[in-house]
From Swiss-Prot:
Record HAMAP family: RimP (MF_01077)
Alphabetical UniProt keywords: Cytoplasm, Ribosome biogenesis
GO cellular component: cytoplasm
Matches recorded under PANTHER family: RIBOSOME MATURATION FACTOR RIMP (PTHR33867:SF1)
Localization in the cell: Cytoplasm
The species this protein was found in: Chlorobium phaeovibrioides (strain DSM 265 / 1930)
Functional note: Required for maturation of 30S ribosomal subunits.
NCBIfam families the record matches: PRK14641.1
Primary localization class, coarse: cytoplasm
Any one GO biological process: ribosomal small subunit biogenesis
Family under the similarity heading: Belongs to the RimP family.
Protein name as it appears in the record: Ribosome maturation factor RimP
Gene3D superfamilies, per database record: RimP-like superfamily, N-terminal
Length: 172
């Protein structure tokens, strides 16, 4: 079922050239429930962030595609919920290309060093390099302010291969 659904999602996304959803790409999908009532959540993004009208457009197109396919109706049943949305705040970055739209924002990053020891830091994403096979990110670590003047920390560059998890954070 997952493969057939993924195929439909990718068909709809590949047919968006020249539409309001052009540039939107697939992040992930979850399917819950039984044939009596299924819920399909499709997560998409765009390099400049996905808008609600793009999600609505893709939701309509995907629903039409699923409902016209007898095989999919047999798999999903007649009663299914379909939600197309963007990754919310606090959701981890899944694809390398998502880093670009978070430049200047605060990220919480878990990474492993050369010895395999896991570390975590929070900082502003300054730069992203998506070179083939050797991408990296540069972060300015956030200093917790205490009485007096806090120490200034050096920028840190991490290879994307060392990043275990990166999550955009809200700044207050």
């Amino acid at each position: 079922m997952q493969e057939a659904l993924l195929k439909c999602v990718h068909e709809v996304l590949s047919a968006t050239a020249g539409t309001k959803a052009e540039g939107v790409y697939f992040i992930g999908m979850t399917v819950k429930g039984s044939v009596v009532h299924r819920k399909i959540d499709v997560v998409v993004d765009a390099d400049s962030g996905v808008r609600i009208d793009q999600c609505a457009f893709l939701s309509r197109r995907l629903r039409e595609r699923l409902e016209e396919d007898e095989e999919m109706i047999g798999i999903l049943g007649d009663n299914f919920d379909l939600v197309v949305g963007s990754p919310g705040l606090g959701e981890p970055i899944i694809l390398d290309r998502q880093y670009g739209r978070h430049v200047g924002r605060l990220l919480r990053v878990s990474y492993s060093d050369l010895e395999g020891v896991e570390h975590e830091l929070t900082g502003h994403l300054l730069e992203v390099s998506l070179a083939e096979g050797a991408g990296s990110i540069m972060l300015k670590p956030r200093v917790e302010k205490k009485k007096g003047k806090g120490e200034e920390l050096e920028n840190i560059t991490l290879e994307l291969g060392a990043v275990l998890r990166a999550v955009p954070e809200a700044e207050i």
